[in-house]
């Protein structure tokens, strides 16, 4: 299934104007609790990493509310989602929802309409949702496969953030792979953790079949069983050209949590004093410590 074959109803949830209208109304209604951060750049072996931390008291309260909600037994914020956070349906199996506690503006979630565990294998419909999003909006899609990979909710959800100057992205890692063939796994020298990059997009752009094929190739290259139930922990990241898979061993190292965006050179700490800890450990060693 190629993006231009999609029903127009599928794409209405990915209309930037619609997204911005829902964001604006969610702010007015007080249901969008944006977390304000400051940031610092840390370079490690020539690779720049952006490290964000919470700054305002309001944002700290929002972060505490998020943590409390995540710990409520049986609480599922996606079944159903807050209607004021819903952008719209994305095919028969997914809906597009605003992240209630965004660190990055316009952070979207592609949530399954029926419950599936976050550790379940990814299906054709998941890659369809991801391909439609990347084809329409560009940016970066990602998936935290289980709590050890940084997932905060057990209900299956892919995520998307827009491309911004100096923001999270794969280009800092794929710059050396520019001549790599299509649909072949590649290892990027200088990255000490197990991983596989696969170029998935050809002249016709992003499509679900090639995105899924790229994922299967990356799983084979990294030793992940793509149809396991449950899947071992892993991170998936994809932009309009590349897909990256990183198997994971644990969610945090020395109190610093890492999700998929860490492998897009973007880290988040809760307290500014943890910046020095990231600097002491080194971003590359931090990412290696939580990988396999």
Predicted ranges, named:
Residues 1-122, 165-210, 216-292:
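Active-site microenvironments that recognize anionic phosphate/pyrophosphate groups
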Residues 84-85, 95-100, 130, 141-150:
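Catalytic micro-motifs at enzyme active sites that drive phosphoryl/nucleotidyl and oxygen chemistry
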Residues 92-94, 106-107, 137-143, 154-158:
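Generic beta-strand structural signal
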Residues 112, 146-171:
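Histidine-centered divalent-metal-coordination microenvironment in nucleic-acid enzymes
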Residues 114-136, 142:
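Intrinsically disordered, low-complexity linker/loop segments enriched in Gly/Pro
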Residues 117, 132, 148-151, 288:
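Short, surface-exposed, charged/polar-biased interaction segments
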Residues 134-138, 162, 181:
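Short, well-ordered alpha-helical segments in soluble proteins
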Residues 139-152, 227-239:
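A short glycine-rich, hydrophobically flanked beta-strand micro-motif that places a catalytic Asp/Glu
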């Amino acid at each position: 299934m190629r993006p231009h074959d999609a029903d127009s109803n599928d794409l209405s949830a990915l209309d930037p104007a619609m997204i911005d209208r829902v964001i604006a109304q969610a702010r007015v209604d007080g249901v969008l609790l944006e977390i304000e951060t400051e940031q610092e750049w840390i370079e490690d072996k020539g690779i720049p990493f952006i490290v964000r931390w919470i700054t305002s008291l309001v944002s700290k309260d929002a972060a505490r509310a998020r943590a409390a909600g995540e710990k409520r037994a049986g609480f599922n914020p996606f079944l159903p989602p807050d209607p004021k956070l819903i952008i719209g349906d994305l095919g028969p199996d997914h809906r597009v929802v605003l992240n209630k506690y965004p660190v990055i503006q316009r952070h979207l979630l592609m949530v399954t309409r029926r419950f599936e565990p976050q550790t379940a294998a990814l299906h054709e419909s998941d890659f369809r949702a991801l391909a439609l999003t990347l084809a329409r909006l560009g940016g970066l899609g990602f998936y935290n496969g289980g709590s050890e990979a940084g997932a905060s909710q057990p209900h299956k959800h892919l995520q998307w953030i827009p491309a911004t100057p100096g923001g999270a992205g794969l280009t800092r890692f794929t710059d050396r792979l520019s001549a790599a063939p299509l649909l072949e796994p590649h290892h990027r020298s200088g990255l000490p953790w197990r991983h596989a990059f696969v170029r998935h997009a050809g002249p016709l752009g992003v499509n679900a079949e090639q995105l899924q094929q790229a994922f299967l190739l990356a799983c084979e290259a990294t030793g992940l069983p793509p149809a396991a139930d449950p899947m071992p922990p892993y991170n998936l990241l994809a932009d309009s050209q590349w897909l990256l898979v990183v198997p994971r061993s644990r969610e945090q190292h020395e109190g610093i949590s890492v999700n998929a965006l860490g492998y897009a050179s973007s880290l988040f700490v809760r307290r500014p004093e943890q910046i020095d800890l990231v600097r002491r450990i080194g971003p590359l060693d931090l990412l290696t410590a939580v990988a396999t």
